[in-house]
Amino acid sequence: MKFLKNKAPANLVDNGRFVEAITCNKVKPNPSCVSNCLKFLSEVLAVEAITDSARNLATVSKSDILLFSLLQLSSNKQSGSSLPLFDLVFILLSTFFLFHNPCN
């Protein structure tokens, strides 16, 4: 969790919202849970397209989020920079939780 504190806004980590956002640990699906997932990913991964899409949740799909994550990886590779191992693991775990959560 130490690496998350360097990336996520303090309020996400300090009050535990990141756990809710990334796992969407809700009894019943609801739009705010999906919104929290998207907000957290956009803040941590700095993928502006997710933030834009979050304004219209009806158009956001899990494949969109996966695509944005892969585009982020691709743009980093093309620019010659490499993602730290923690970033790569975080992206993969985020994708896993998005595909295996009760929100959708």
From Swiss-Prot:
Q: Where in the cell is it found?
A: Membrane
Q: What is its main location?
A: membrane
Which residues are listed as membrane-spanning?
A: 80-98
Output the superkingdom of the source species. Eukaryota
Its GO CC terms are: membrane
How does the record classify its membrane topology? Single-pass membrane protein
UniProt keyword Transmembrane helix, yes or no? yes
Q: Which UniProt keywords are present, listed alphabetically?
A: Membrane, Transmembrane, Transmembrane helix
Query: What more is known?
Result: Partially overlaps CSE1.
What protein is this chain from?
Putative uncharacterized protein YGL239C
Q: Which organism is it from?
A: Saccharomyces cerevisiae (strain ATCC 204508 / S288c)
